[in-house]
């Protein structure tokens, strides 16, 4: 067991466990703690603690400090998969989120019970990145996008083969969601068309439209684009979809199975044709070779105002990472290269570049 003394020694900070210090009887004021904190992080947060927080119970120092806190609160749940998915726990998490708390989604893997599933506390590195990203956004003191309508699409699409199989990609939607949160933080009215992912934006003010297939993504994107001032196409839309979809599970046969594919509709090209003079259209390009040339060609061909280039050659960038390294090219052929950063920081860089094009 890790004792308070061990934590105090390693962190070189006092460790508060109870209302009264066991050494000298001094009162640990939960009110002072609540007022002093810039951010309240509860990690790990058990089902018991989450339930008490949702109910407003204050029977220990952690809970009384939470009720006294005027700062942002981040909660990192950690429990067995069945406890996490229980309706009571989900209801409690919903209550906490609706009260403005930030929920750091638990990860999946081996649990203390020996089972495998969702419920592990997010990795410490991920929690730190969430906190850093939050404070990076808090540095924005103005609302330069106030009154602007921003449409963003994000995440993958899934193209069904039969009722149990589909074609998709590794996109987590993290980059597009970070863009939506950054735009909302700058005062924009944000609509997010989101493919099938587990992540959700932090801001409660974002209008999220959930879609699954490329066809649904296209329909929702076209509709959202009609009324927006700025569009950012961050979704990883499937380039191909099965020519036919079986309504029954395809059984394993003795021979090979051939799936005929047809191209999906090009959303960026369609919106480029629809674009009005007062609209700004931003695309993304994921390249493996001749990156700048290919991205510049896509920008011109699809009538984009700006394109964000990701290279699969860059370690720590692209799908499946919480970091990204981008190059931005605008229609005047200005090229801005950025270092590897968290996706929250990258989102802020992209929005700042957009601001130079709309003002």
Swiss-Prot record:
Q: Which GO terms describe its molecular function?
A: FMN binding; phosphopantothenate--cysteine ligase activity; phosphopantothenoylcysteine decarboxylase activity; sulfinoalanine decarboxylase activity
Q: Name one GO cellular component term.
A: phosphopantothenoylcysteine decarboxylase complex
Gene3D superfamilies per record: CoaB-like, Flavin prenyltransferase-like
Q: Describe activity versus temperature.
A: Optimum temperature is 35 degrees Celsius.
Q: Which superkingdom heads the taxonomic lineage of this protein's source? A: Bacteria
> In its UniProt record, which GO terms are filed under biological process?
coenzyme A biosynthetic process; pantothenate catabolic process
Asked if the record carries the keyword Lyase, the reply is: yes
Give the regulation of activity.
Slightly stimulated in the presence of 1 mM Mg(2+).
Q: What does this protein do?
A: Catalyzes the decarboxylation of L-cysteine to cysteamine and of 3-sulfino-L-alanine (cysteine sulfinic acid) to hypotaurine. Also catalyzes the decarboxylation of various amino acids such as L-lysine, L-glutamate, L-asparaginate and L-proline. In vitro, shows highest activity with L-cysteine as substrate.
Name of the protein in question = Cysteine/Cysteine sulfinic acid decarboxylase
Which gene is annotated as encoding this protein in its UniProt record?
Answer: undec1A
């Amino acid at each position: 067991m890790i004792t308070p003394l061990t934590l105090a020694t390693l962190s070189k900070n006092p460790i508060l466990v109870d209302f009264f210090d066991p050494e000298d009887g001094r009162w640990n004021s939960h009110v002072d703690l609540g007022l002093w904190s810039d951010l309240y992080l509860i990690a790990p947060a058990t089902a018991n603690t989450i339930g008490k927080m949702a109910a407003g119970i204050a029977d220990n120092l952690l809970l009384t400090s939470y009720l006294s806190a005027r700062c942002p609160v981040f909660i990192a749940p950690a429990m067995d998969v069945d406890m996490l998915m229980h309706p009571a726990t989900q209801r409690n998490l919903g209550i906490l989120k609706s009260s403005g708390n930030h929920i750091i989604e638990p990860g999946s893997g081996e649990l203390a019970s020996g089972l495998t599933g969702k419920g592990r506390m997010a990795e410490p590195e991920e929690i730190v990145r969430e906190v850093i990203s939050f404070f990076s956004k808090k540095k924005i003191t103005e609302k330069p996008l106030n009154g602007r309508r921003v449409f963003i699409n994000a995440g993958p699409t899934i193209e069904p083969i039969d009722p149990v199989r589909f074609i998709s990609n590794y996109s987590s939607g993290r980059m597009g969601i970070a863009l939506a949160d950054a735009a909302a933080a700058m005062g924009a009215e944000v609509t997010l068309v989101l493919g099938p992912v587990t992540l959700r934006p932090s801001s409660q003010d974002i209008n999220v439209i959930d879609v699954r297939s490329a066809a649904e993504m296209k329909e929702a994107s076209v509709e959202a684009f009609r009324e927006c001032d700025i569009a950012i196409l961050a979704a990883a839309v499937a380039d191909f979809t099965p020519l036919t979809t079986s309504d029954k599970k395809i059984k394993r046969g003795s021979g090979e199975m051939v799936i005929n594919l047809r191209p999906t509709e090009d959303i960026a090209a369609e919106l480029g044709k629809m674009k009005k003079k007062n609209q700004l259209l931003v695309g993304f390009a994921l390249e493996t070779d001749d990156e700048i040339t290919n991205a510049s060609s896509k920008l011109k061909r699809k009538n984009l105002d700006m394109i964000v280039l990701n290279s699969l050659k860059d370690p720590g960038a692209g799908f499946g990472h919480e970091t990204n390294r981008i190059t931005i090219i605008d229609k005047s052929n200005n090229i801005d290269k950025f270092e590897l950063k968290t996706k929250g920081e990258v989102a802020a860089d992209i929005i700042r570049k957009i601001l130079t094009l709309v003002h």
